[in-house]
């Protein structure tokens, strides 16, 4: 009998195993054989939406059934916004289609959470037969001009007998499934967007590039010292490191710094008394005496001298000594020998920081160690780490086995396919379907803090106590303790780009402050374990006030509907008082935990729009005007990062208002966002928005930290605003530094991180440490009136371009020649390398000339797939040849650029053709052909032409204004759905005028017809079909309420500002385009042109006429006015 029972048991086990194998084989039959293709067709779809096409092909030998499976993918934008019910956070057409959009070819689309969507085949439709293709079209809320807007690792699941199997779709493991961007329809974000056109080799060619020499770069230190004098005579490091100090409190730390230096160069180590004569080595002395007193950071100053007898580094404090050691390493990097001479140096700012987003995508402990080393090399001294955001929680707060909140890192630090999110956060941002991602252990963080302390780097933790906090909220709600930090009865709408109510902490729940206090205590314990004091904390996001107004926790209990309405009205009137009290409580809690410095994004310390006339430009005073007492019992620092315009409020003015009202100010304008692309290349990593397409090396080099009227994106010239749009500068010592930022939501690999960070991090370090003489030539533009003609004239200031270009050429040249090799050799980090340029030479034979802006690099060429030819200057080719080029370092073959293909025709490149359009436009014909065909002449001035300040324009020249800004600021917006350069009554063309055909005419014609159907089909509500056998609508859409909106929505919801990000700094949204209007472009005086050419002015006049804009502005209690007499802060 026993053997019978045993046999039954074995049979059961075998059946289970067979079922598991069968299920796994079934899912692999689907995921291995589904070929996904994704294509952005046009960014000029209905209501300025992006039209995107998805093709699903069965490349296997078996049919794929139409039931039993469904697939998931991440999309960074809201899809089909016209049919999305924000209040319910789901699609809604009618009850039978609740939460679905019916796509063509038999699929349903469903929003899940975060960026995740699910497509499900409609049962009884038809299986996908071998070599069969299914297509459907997506409408995305914003434009898309990069492959990196898409995410890899689509995956599918099968459900059989209650068991779920998941597997990644093999064809989407990288971004090769995204088709090329190949015309102005998917290059352009808005009409006239010439700077978004990708560069061709002909556009890069520079026949007169002045390369830096070895002698110029051999002893070039980046960042540039204040004073340096070196000679060609050299010496080695000697035999011993001597160290000494009169300050016994730092003796142990000085020993560790000296020991690290001795081990690196294999030298002896001897402690000495300051003043003791030594020779044949390196002398490290902390004197305690200031080298310079009237400088922002005297402790970081140092003096380095090199003679035949000794290498001497002296500093008043340990930070300066560490800076001196890094300068010594830079001087000796070329051949491990030091030149005779001396350096005297100190920084322009005490705060030179990087905000590194480790929460969205986790880089790992080893990478962070390398990053600290690079920061020290280039004298950056603050590292801000967001511990969590919507995408993850990245720190083990406590390693005790019984720690009650282990779910924070165990759930928040991992992603997998778990819809209930009990074991991990739901898969997102292209993560694998299986468990992926990671977090720092407590021991890892202790090591990082210790290492940073010896490198003169302070690690500052950023906490999101407000929006963008889902990585902390979800683990706590799913843990056994069930700590809710939000209101589960609230509506789902919290953030348009993250439509889930559990992504924002509720300030009215006491659990939120308990969590915040717990985080501070745990962090303090971690710093204590590293023997480093926790001095500073950062608040990385503001409160979501939609949540405050809707949550029951923000009102007294047991209110009837009338009382609740009255309380809501009172709260809405006093919302800025509520915000101030919550901010004060955050600062007080930090101070109570022994933290005396609190940083926060600028929105935390400013008001919201209210009936009293307060705006985001109204800054809370640090002193209470009624009691004359300090509001905050800790030092408060505002990270000034918003330089956009909201309802005609110029937010770049806030920096001076912070300084005037007692805050320390760190400037962090958009030009310091390293997540922006290096160049407008759809194939390379990097983000963008409607204002900034890319930030080049030259653009970043011209960053002027001391100018409070410049560094403003898309100001009409040189990123400087009008003098009237600038405020009186606050106390100079209130501006304490700069903060660069890297948002990693779209960066799936460390290769992408490195490409965006390096070498731009070095340029940022140069501007943050060293002030160049030409910086003062960046000034605001001045407006005056001609007393005779009464005409308003703008005098545009011109920077000192000769000095700028000369210094830029030397610094960027030495970065290529020396620093990129240092990054590869010493740190193992591969920086971005610019591709080469080339052009066709005239003559009887076809020849090409090649060049590169990367000093000491070669151009390599491959013809028809043959091996690469080194150091190409001139190359003979045939017209039918396929020529590929790349830039490569002769000593480091892995240090190379992407490959580019050279078009062997004499036709101008798209950029060259657009340059001609731009030159015509700048001849005071901006939009003339389009405008005259579209609208009658103006009755007041039929010959009017919008003003243009510069006589010439080159789309690749950062010094010139952006024509997209000019064209968008002046003409009325184009009708929705109108592609660039369209005339009325024209059919949708196979390509825009002036753009060479980049596809065969047949394909382009089909593309045009397909998009034309979409445009003509708008306004038809097609959601009246039944589920089985869905007929195909325009552009392959069914179930899309395109024109009128649904479920109580009046039309399509207006687009929120920017493509969504919860991490810019966290909680900050990038500037975007609202359908039907253009962003404000500073520096364009409104009085120079009629209102109809300026949508902002027209809208403002209409609002004032309707009484929506008050003539006088009041101030909320607690919203401070400037204490500078001639300047108001309201």
UniProtKB/Swiss-Prot annotation:
Prismatic layer of shell (at protein level). Expressed primarily in the mantle with highest level in the mantle edge and lower level in the mantle pallium. Its main location: secreted. Its EC number is 3.2.1.52. Residues 1001-1030, 1037-1072 have a biased composition (Low complexity). Keywords: Hydrolase, Secreted, Signal. Residues 1001-1075, 1102-1130 are annotated as: Disordered. Residues 1-23 form the signal peptide. GO terms for cellular component: extracellular region; membrane. Belongs to the glycosyl hydrolase 20 family. This is Putative beta-hexosaminidase. It comes from Pinctada maxima (Silver-lipped pearl oyster). The lineage of its organism: Eukaryota, Metazoa, Spiralia, Lophotrochozoa, Mollusca.
